[in-house]
Swiss-Prot record:
Biased composition range(s): Acidic residues: 381-391
Organism name: Homo sapiens
Comp. bias regions, Polar residues: 364-377
Reported function: Probably involved in the organization of the actin cytoskeleton. Induced membrane extensions in fibroblasts.
Entry's family note: Belongs to the BORG/CEP family.
Name of the protein in question: Cdc42 effector protein 1
Annotated ranges, domain CRIB: 38-52
Amino acid sequence: MPGPQGGRGAATMSLGKLSPVGWVSSSQGKRRLTADMISHPLGDFRHTMHVGRGGDVFGDTSFLSNHGGSSGSTHRSPRSFLAKKLQLVRRVGAPPRRMASPPAPSPAPPAISPIIKNAISLPQLNQAAYDSLVVGKLSFDSSPTSSTDGHSSYGLDSGFCTISRLPRSEKPHDRDRDGSFPSEPGLRRSDSLLSFRLDLDLGPSLLSELLGVMSLPEAPAAETPAPAANPPAPTANPTGPAANPPATTANPPAPAANPSAPAATPTGPAANPPAPAASSTPHGHCPNGVTAGLGPVAEVKSSPVGGGPRGPAGPALGRHWGAGWDGGHHYPEMDARQERVEVLPQARASWESLDEEWRAPQAGSRTPVPSTVQANTFEFADAEEDDEVKV
């Protein structure tokens, strides 16, 4: 049948065309690479000729004739070609052999490599000391500096060196003694915390201020003269008011009747106003005018005119009268009785009446006595004393 036969022929033709492709590829893949498969030189400077490992040379070798070879015929034998190649190799290899001699010295490298300098360039206060420390004290390994060709390949000159660590036994004073590392007064090496000293001025403290305030009262007390050096100003009026209570009560111008009488009466309480200030300066003053002076009790003396006991104005008397008239305050009854027992043991009956007379002028007048009246009072007291001595 033509239909089936045509179909079979078409099938066989398709198989015949396709089958050789696969079979040939498998057989040709096993062949080895040969010199015939190498392409010819491409004409550029890299592919002018080819030289194999076994010495086979092929390609354009016209450049060999330009270097002194015979340029007779273009077809050369392999031997002549190998001879030319060997000559070329000798000519190319000769210059390296001539360069075996020591070449011109290269410029010397820096004294210290920048890498090494940056590695040890810590902040230093003294740059000169730092340079001397690096160059002088640090020991560099210079044993392999000399090589066979006479050029330094390792060490300080080449920029590569080994910095040895300083021993701990070497102290700063040893370096200072050598002179290579000058000493700096501001920097000191401390091996322990006990030798560390930090000087800081934080200003005056509260304790120092308190001590200064406490030392102020002691200084005036030391500068004040002794009580014995004071002039006996109170003794200008020998007739003490506390020592003569009957005379005060018997005198017509009593303090209660005339407030200004004590300043004019020689036997009045204000006859010796500066007595407390003169006698109580080394003892101190109180805010209310009371004198805090303590001293021996005044001796009682008899007066030929007044007929009563009379004694010098001592510290106790000055304290009593200074509190009664100068300060405008009076002693309590207990203090008055105590002084009465010590100074006037025989005038117990008239003491209470004397206290009542003292209290009257205190409520009426508190004005201090003028200085002029005090001066007149002292003069009057001196005149009265002279009159009493004459009688």
